């Protein structure tokens, strides 16, 4: 008779084996898509309101927005009477490139509504939902437990042509738990500590390691977004990953600190990081015209003069609302979606897989269908 540990090991191998077979079985469908690489980028806690209408005028002051620079200086950078111009000032790449060559979803003023499925609208549940395809999670907030759920990234890493080509980069240290570092075997750089390496660092890698070591992290050991970006760009050139998760967290950090001026600045920087990453990859033959970016957020926030600083349901209504931008060779250039559409954060996982020709729902029956952003082949 098998012992309990032995049976558990056999069961674990069977699960991984079935997941690998499911991934491999759907690999040939990838030939129908031009996308060979997918990058999921998250700007933490960015509201749909700022995404579609730019800066909130009622918060461009010290009393309610906690700003440190002068109101005149802040308005010069981020304000225009036209909301379409305001959003371009805040997110120039999203609106001048993604919205022209791809699609942007989630403008609730147009009846285009995106929401989380999980009942919490906090970070860990949001990252779990978008990466696993469902909102089931034994935590309701940000407890540092290793995620028991299988993510689409871990699943894709079992596909023969993608093994070792899936990586996670982010400023939040809990990505190690979200993507379950011990089990998933993904390359994960999360927070202010860098993963060990068996190879001698390049001069740039050595410099980055020194900068991580000598730069004070954010609260709770989170890294600066700029350091995440520089590390990611170096990894891109040395490891040539095909599937990436990228999480920038300063937008949420500054909102919780009540600094609306820094929320706007970090959102604009995040947009710049996305532009830089896109242009870098388009300049590399292995990525050019065969890479899709999905840009989104993990949750929304409260509204009004005070509650914009926080999120979570039911305490802060509106926290459940999200938005998504998609650009790539398999996404029609429909721009800002004006159709009455309702979509869920959970659809992102199957979308990542579908772009690469795989059916994630074969491994995770709880996952809904992909987002309606792919061209009909």
Show where each model-derived region lies.
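Bacterial N-terminal signal peptides
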Residues: 11-23
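Long, well-ordered early-domain segments
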Residues: 75-177
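Polar, surface-exposed loop/tail segments
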Residues: 358-377
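Metal-dependent active-site segment of extracytoplasmic phospho-/sulfohydrolases and closely related
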Residues: 39-40, 48, 269-310, 352
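Active-site-proximal N-terminal segment of extracellular/periplasmic enzymes that hydrolyze or transfer
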Residues: 29-103
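Acidic, His- and aromatic-enriched active-site or binding-groove loops in soluble protein domains
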Residues: 132-145, 184-221
């Amino acid at each position: 008779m098998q012992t309990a540990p032995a049976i558990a090991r056999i069961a674990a191998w069977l699960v991984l084996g079935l997941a690998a077979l499911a991934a491999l079985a759907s690999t040939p469908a990838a030939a129908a898509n031009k996308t060979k690489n997918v990058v999921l980028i998250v700007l933490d806690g960015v509201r749909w309101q700022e995404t579609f209408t730019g800066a909130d005028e009622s918060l461009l002051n010290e009393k309610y927005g906690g700003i440190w620079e002068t109101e005149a200086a802040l308005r010069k950078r981020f304000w225009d009477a036209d909301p379409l111009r305001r959003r371009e000032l805040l997110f120039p790449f999203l609106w001048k490139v993604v919205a022209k060559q791809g699609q942007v979803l989630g403008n609730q003023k147009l009846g285009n509504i995106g929401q989380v499925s999980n009942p919490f609208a906090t970070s860990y549940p949001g990252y779990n939902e978008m990466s696993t395809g469902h909102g089931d999670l034994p935590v309701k907030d940000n407890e540092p437990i290793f995620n028991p759920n299988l993510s689409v990234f871990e699943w894709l890493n079992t596909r023969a042509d993608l093994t070792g080509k899936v990586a996670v980069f982010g400023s939040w240290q809990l990505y190690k738990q979200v993507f379950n570092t011990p089990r998933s075997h993904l390359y994960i750089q999360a927070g202010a500590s860098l993963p060990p390496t068996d190879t001698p660092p390049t001069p740039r890698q050595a410099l980055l390691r020194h900068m991580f070591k000598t730069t004070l992290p954010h609260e709770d050991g989170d890294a600066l977004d700029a350091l995440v970006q520089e590390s990611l760009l170096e990894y891109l050139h040395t490891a040539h990953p095909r599937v990436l998760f990228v999480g920038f967290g300063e937008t949420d950090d500054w909102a919780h600190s009540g600094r609306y001026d820094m929320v706007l600045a970090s959102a604009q920087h995040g947009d710049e990081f996305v532009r830089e990453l896109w242009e870098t990859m388009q300049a590399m033959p292995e990525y050019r015209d065969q890479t899709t970016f999905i840009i989104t957020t993990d949750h929304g926030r409260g509204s009004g003069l005070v509650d914009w600083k926080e999120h979570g349901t039911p305490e802060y209504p509106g926290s459940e609302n999200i938005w998504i931008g998609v650009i790539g060779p398999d996404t029609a250039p429909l721009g800002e979606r004006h159709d009455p559409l309702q979509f869920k954060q959970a659809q992102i996982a199957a979308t990542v897989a579908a772009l690469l020709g795989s059916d994630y729902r074969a491994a995770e029956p709880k996952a809904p269908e992909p987002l309606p952003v792919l061209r009909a082949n």
